[in-house]
Amino acid sequence: MNLEEIYPITLQYQPFRDEDWRVVEEESHYVHRMLDGVLSNWPKNLLKEWLYRHPDCMEDYAFLNLERLKFTLETWPLERVPGSEAFKDESFCDNFENIEERAEDNNDWLARYMLKEGTWNTPIVLLENQDRYNLSTQVQLKQPYHLLEGHRRLSFLNGLRRLNKARPHHQVWLAKIHT
């Protein structure tokens, strides 16, 4: 199987890989290549935190047409940040709400960070879906917001909410589909 068969829609957005399919392209090179090319409207942080760090997940949302997404970095009050209802799989959120337990694990730096800071280290990405986009039968998009990236972070925030340890405001990348 070759890369074109594995990533039929997103090959042009993928970081360069070797013959064993391991990413070999440097992060900074990838970001510049995307900004100089097909994703020139994307914020650097999202190219790095989402597409470069999770390239195997791109196909999940390729039907949105990544080039049409526009992003705004916003600060939201805690009450506006959605909970499990924004997840494609709402049970995923439940599996990570035990932030205090996870923070005790020395390997879970994110849980420790969020428990200490009351927020995430980098904003989650939510697709604004007020217009009820139904672009694919593969993924049922949630309304009014669908979580695209940051599943563990949003799960941990829900755990912080339950413990009354969440900060009152959080940064969020809001994605909109422009036609």
What would you call each of these model-derived segments?
Residues 159-179:
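Alpha-helical oligomerization segments
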Residues 141-158:
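A sequence-level detector for short glycine-anchored, His/Arg-bearing signature motifs
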Residues 1-91:
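N-terminal extension/subdomain marker
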Residues 61-144, 165-166:
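Short alpha-helix boundary/capping and kink motifs at helix termini
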